[in-house]
Amino acid sequence: MSRYTPSEFAHQIGTGLLSFPVTHFKSDLSFDEAAYRANLSWLFSHEAAGLFAAGGTGEFFSLTPAETDRVVRAAVAETGGRLPVIAPAGYGTAMAKEYCQAAEAAGADGILLLPPYLTEASADGVAAHVEQVCKSTRLGVIVYNRANQVLDENHLERLAERCPNLVGFKDGVGDLELMTRIYSRLGERFTYIGGLPTAETFAMPYLTMGVTTYSSAIFNFVPKFALDFYAAVRAADHAKAYAMLNDFVLPYIALRNRKRGYAVSIVKAGMKVIGRSAGPVRAPLTDLTEAELAELSALVARIADVQKLAA
């Protein structure tokens, strides 16, 4: 059972940076629970406000429901209540409800509702999907506005009235006008989370629209850098934030953009660079080439000593 009411959950996840761990695989691509838990233990030495288990960076799309349950249970066990664990739900409405029920049974504290899979629907249909999922669980729900699951301020306002446990809004669209309209209409009703790939890029402008946190993929392998950047953003230290963007984030994004799917692959590559390998990605994703891995290694070395990052 969650330690948080939905409103308490919403408050907690808005207080700091959110961790978005990769899912560890063995060479045969099976889930490596021991390595996953050991890595979470290391990450806990760096302060975060919440943890997304088996999320997008955790290759949710490549996990079976049983594997997802194992990952969530491992995260719950390893965190030991130190921070909220956010479990994924996705695909069609019926499956999303089952994921929510499994998350509750596993002891997760909240739900990240990912977009439905391989279907197109009207905003009214998407809103109905979100409402049904929210009403199937007692946990606080974060809706991920992305791909084929994009809601505007009108639909979100109605959902907020009908679903008290819909407490989070994660943006993966990057439409500043839409974000402005949503925040102007809903205000503090939601906790707003940045959810674009390499969310650091959007952190400064999004802060002015109520987005107090984001899920950081680079926290996986350069946690101190990620936390320092987040602190600079929250302190409105634009000079420091832009320097950090130029030193690491923007070159990192250029490497990430080499191939579709690298938003996940490059994070696992970063883990390998610091000596904390999480294994390969599962198909249809592909790992970075050796040459690209060397480029990433040079980027990481530019910002800090690798041994200190892995200590």
UniProtKB/Swiss-Prot annotation:
Top-level taxon of origin: Bacteria
Residue ranges the record marks as coiled coil: none
CDD domains: KDGDH
InterPro entries per the UniProt record, alphabetical: Aldolase_TIM (IPR013785), DapA-like (IPR002220), Dehydro-deoxyglucarate_dehyd (IPR017655)
Key words of the record: Lyase, Plasmid
Reaction equation(s) it catalyzes: 5-dehydro-4-deoxy-D-glucarate + H(+) = 2,5-dioxopentanoate + CO2 + H2O
A GO biological process held by the record: D-glucarate catabolic process
Gene Ontology MF terms in the entry: 4-hydroxy-tetrahydrodipicolinate synthase activity; 5-dehydro-4-deoxyglucarate dehydratase activity
Pfam families reported for this sequence: DHDPS
EC numbers: 4.2.1.41
Family: Belongs to the DapA family.
Pathway: Carbohydrate acid metabolism; D-glucarate degradation; 2,5-dioxopentanoate from D-glucarate: step 2/2
Name used for this protein in its record: Probable 5-dehydro-4-deoxyglucarate dehydratase
